[in-house]
Structures are given as C-alpha cells and as structure tokens.
Amino acid sequence: MILYLTYNDQPSGVYWSQVTDVVAHLNTLGGPRVRLLALVSARDYFTIRRKIRAHCPDAVVLPMVPQMKRWRVNAAIVALACRWFRPTGIIARGVLATWMALRARDKALVGKVCLDARGAYAGEWEEYRIVDDDALIAQFRAVEREAVLQTDMRLAVSQALVRHWQERYGYTGQQHVVVPCTLGRAHEEHVGPGGAMRSELGFAESDVVLVYSGSVAGWQSFGLLGGLLRGALAEQPKLKVLFLSPPDSGIDGLAAEFPGRVLRRFLQAEEVPQALQACDAALLVREDTLTNRVASPTKFAEYLANGLPVVISAHIGDFSQLVQVQRLGHVWNEGDALPVLGRPVPEERQRCRSFSLANFTKQAHTEAYRTLVAALT
C-alpha cells in the first residue's frame, strides 16, 4: 500500500481535482493500492471528513494537532498511521507533509517518500506571508531543502520548479517527474454550448466576455489585474468581465466604475464549466514573483478545456511559452495594454479544448504516474 498524505488542505475544487481524482487514477494503474490519509482541521472535522469521503470513500481523515506553530507534532499521527497500514511508500503533498513522512522513514515505518510539490513553498511564504508568523516563515527554507534533497522521488508541477530546486538547493538528481495541474472530472466532460448560461448572465451575442475564475487575493494579483481591466474596459466598448470569485472589495469597486459591464458570481465547482463556456476568453494575469514563475495554475487547463483562449502573463511557469508556441491565446507583458479581444470561432474553441484534453488529463500523464508508483514500491 501507498499512502497519499495531505496536511491542512481544505476541501475545494482544487482538492478534488489534484488530490482525490489523482488517488482514484493511481488506483487504476494496476499497482499497489493508494489510500488517502488527510490530516484536517479539528475545528470542523466532521464536516470536512464527510466532504472528503463523498469524493474518496475509503479516505482516512484524521484531526490534526491544533495551531500551525505546532505542525511538527503531527508527525506522531503519521507514524501511528504507518504502524497501522504498513505502507511501502508515502506521497506527501507539500513540504510540511513531506517532513512528517520523512520522520516516519527515519523510524523505518515506511520505506520511501515522494514529495508532491505544488510550488516553491519557501518563496510563497516569504513573498505572501501565508501565515503572519516570522518564526514559522523562517523554518521553511530548511524544511523545503530537506524535502527536495532527501526524498526518494519528487513530483513537480513544472520544469520551472525543477530549475528552481537546482538553483536554490543544488538538486542534481533525476528522480523526479513533472505533471502539471490536471483537469478535474467536471472539466473533462463536455457540458455543451454555454448559450443558456450566457443569456442567464445577461450577456448579448455582440458582447465579448472575458472571464477570471478563482480568488483575487495574494499571489492572484488583483492590484495588477484591476489596472489592466480598467484600461481595457475604457478602450473596448464591447468588452464585459465576469469574475467567478468570492466577494471582494476590489471587484465591487471595478463594477461601480463600469456599471453593467463587470459581474461577479460565486459558483459551486460543478457549475463552473458551463459558466466558462458562456465566455469568450480567459485571463490569467499575475505579478512577477518566484511563486508565479514556477506555478502551474489549475485554471489554465480548465480555461482551455472549456474552449477559451487565455490571456496570460509572460512568466507563469511553463505555460506562458506554451501559449505562444501553440497559439492558445495571448502572452501579456506588464505595461502593455490588453489586446483587443473578439469572440473565438468554433474551430478555435475546439482546438483549445482538444489541446487541454490531450495534455492535461490524468490519463495523459499515466507513464509519469507509473514511474512515481514504481519508485515507492
């Protein structure tokens, strides 16, 4: 058995597509059983456990030790789980979970550990202060260094992230695979034309609808986004903007400046595909930070899967070059105006969707997943 360990991750669309769907795919490969072990907040434990088990019925969901500053104590819970399940390996999502898994390996409770790295963790904490605690932030470089250099296998979301490991931590090995953030099941299934949703949202056939899906906080860079959209809305009278986001004062301010042209909706994960298909282009603009230079935003594949060309910043992981080479939208450089946007023809929508399904499904990366599982067996 292999355990897939997550620590302090909240159930969300990202968790379903990047954790529970991955566990389900790994269990189709004919190798050892892979079982999710999720350490979650004790504050809302039963609700979180119910949500996770709805997507992954055999998941082991346990309450973690309260308070982030005591995160290391959770290694004892992981050790107990290893004594019970006797796994051959652990895939650990993030460097904190990896540290816990390495402590179990130190005690010979598990044979091998894989770091499932979703980004540059120390850089992200230093740049965006995920937790406002200097002592905790200061721990991260050493923890990430050990996770990168001492694990038996590594899963990176981008080649840019591997280069970061090489430059910052001196990683020289080849014991890694690169799998970008892949599509969740809801986006793999074609839900049909978005005409009904387009009408429901109040968009006319002559409107050009630019969509942004997700949070606008922190590394999502609303300050940069807001300035760019103000200029575009002023210069392109047919342009309208749809935010599929939680409430935000920045979005409210933009909507007040451009009445009837900026809308916000916050939808359930299963409702998002149809809303995306009602739009004409997608926006993936972020500031130039280490966090974003190694990133693999889940929204990129989702936008393409729903037939949307993407306007993307010039420094987003491996994706900016991909957009340019494969003609999947427009690469935007900070300081430039947003390009004049139009409605894509059906052939362009289908090309975007086909590219996403060919490159961003779990099945498209089966060989990488097989390599990972074999390294832990």
Predicted regions and their residues:
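A short, glycine/small-residue-rich beta-strand->loop->alpha-helix junction that serves as a flexible
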Residues: 5-22, 43-45, 92, 217-220, ...
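Nucleotide-activated donor-binding/catalytic signature segment of Leloir-type glycosyltransferases, i.e.
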Residues: 245, 249-281
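N-terminal strand-loop element at the rim of the active site
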Residues: 6-13, 25-72, 161-162, 168, ...
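A charged, aromatic-enriched C-terminal amphipathic alpha-helix characteristic of glycosyltransferases
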Residues: 335-376
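A short, active-site helix/loop in glycosyltransferases that binds the activated sugar's phosphate group
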Residues: 42, 137-175, 183-185, 249-253, ...
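Acceptor-binding helix/loop patch of EC 2.4 sugar-transfer enzymes
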Residues: 7, 111-145, 172, 179-186
